[in-house]
């Protein structure tokens, strides 16, 4: 099988991409291909990746001029990740996308066995479809509801920081289908490409364990989980409410030394000689203990998650009538 590991970066995120590839190489022992989706990166700045044997592909955001709105939380660059659904990616059997603000600690090989499309559930504070959306002030409630006719806004959503898919899902209609969703919902997403992908793969995705997309700084800073108790296949460090110290490359972040060590070792990447991957956990007992510690730490988040679902159901009934029109039953 031919498998591909992809990340995305602009010229300001190249160190993050190097660290990501280094962690995949040294920790996961990844034996497939590596690719950088490069957004507006000068050719000479891509030379390092090419010399390492990492594939590079120029990627432009979809409808860039439409996204210069302060409604969007994230840079338009991230919309370029949708290019992985282009038909020419069928030359690989499976594709794994990992955001460059992640650290990979353990093998990703299990993801290559994905039959369709897989991702981990979004973090509990925003894990419903409605919480991925933004209703413009000049849009009425009925117009907003009509936009999402056919979707259950209470539905659980996935996070796009890591996802994997079997390229059997790719055909000539997938990328145009995503483009169509982008056009229709370009001003309605808090996290643009995440909303679009959740609409496209609505009820057609397989949930991965949270350990494939663990929000490490959130657990450590917001839920007081000791750093040494935070372990997963992939640690994710997304921006959160513009707070400092949550990104793994911030020098005051608890995971900075790990991130910096991976970045320094990027210079030693040799894709002709893949190291043995890290062993994951010493046994099932340790794994079970880790899962329960995580659930206990997130008990408030789980409670909030289910409360939000109940509140949303009640609100939708009030807006749409009971039973709700144009919305799939939960």
Region spans (language model):
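Active-site-proximal specificity loops/subdomain of glycosyltransferases
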Residues: 44-90
């Amino acid at each position: 099988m031919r498998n591909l590991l992809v990340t995305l970066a602009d010229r300001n995120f190249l160190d993050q991409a190097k660290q990501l590839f280094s962690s995949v190489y040294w920790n996961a022992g990844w034996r497939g291909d590596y690719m950088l989706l490069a957004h507006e990166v000068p050719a000479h700045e891509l030379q390092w990746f090419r010399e390492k044997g990492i594939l590079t592909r120029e990627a432009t955001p979809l409808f860039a001029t439409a996204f210069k709105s302060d409604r969007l939380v994230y840079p338009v660059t991230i919309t370029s990740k949708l290019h992985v659904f282009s038909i020419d990616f069928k030359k690989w059997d499976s594709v794994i996308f990992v955001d460059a603000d992640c650290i990979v600690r353990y093998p990703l090989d299990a993801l290559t066995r994905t039959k369709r499309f897989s991702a981990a559930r979004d973090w509990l504070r925003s894990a419903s479809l409605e919480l991925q959306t933004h209703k413009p002030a000049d849009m009425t409630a009925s117009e907003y509801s009509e936009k999402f006719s056919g979707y259950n806004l209470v539905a659980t959503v996935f996070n796009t920081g890591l996802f994997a898919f079997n390229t059997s899902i790719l055909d000539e209609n997938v990328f145009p289908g995503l483009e169509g969703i982008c056009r229709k919902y370009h001003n309605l997403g808090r996290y643009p490409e995440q909303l679009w992908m959740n609409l496209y793969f609505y009820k057609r995705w397989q949930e991965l364990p949270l350990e494939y997309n663990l929000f490490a700084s959130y657990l450590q800073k917001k839920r007081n989980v000791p750093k040494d108790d935070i372990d997963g296949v992939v640690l994710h460090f997304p921006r959160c409410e513009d707070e400092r110290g949550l990104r793994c490359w911030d020098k005051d972040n608890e995971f900075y030394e790990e991130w910096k060590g991976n970045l320094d070792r990027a210079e030693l990447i040799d894709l002709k000689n893949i190291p043995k991957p890290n062993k994951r956990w010493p046994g099932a007992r340790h794994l079970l203990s880790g899962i329960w510690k995580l659930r206990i730490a997130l008990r408030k988040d789980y409670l909030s998650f289910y409360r939000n679902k109940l509140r949303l159901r009640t609100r939708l009934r009030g807006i749409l009538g009971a039973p709700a029109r144009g919305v799939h039953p939960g």
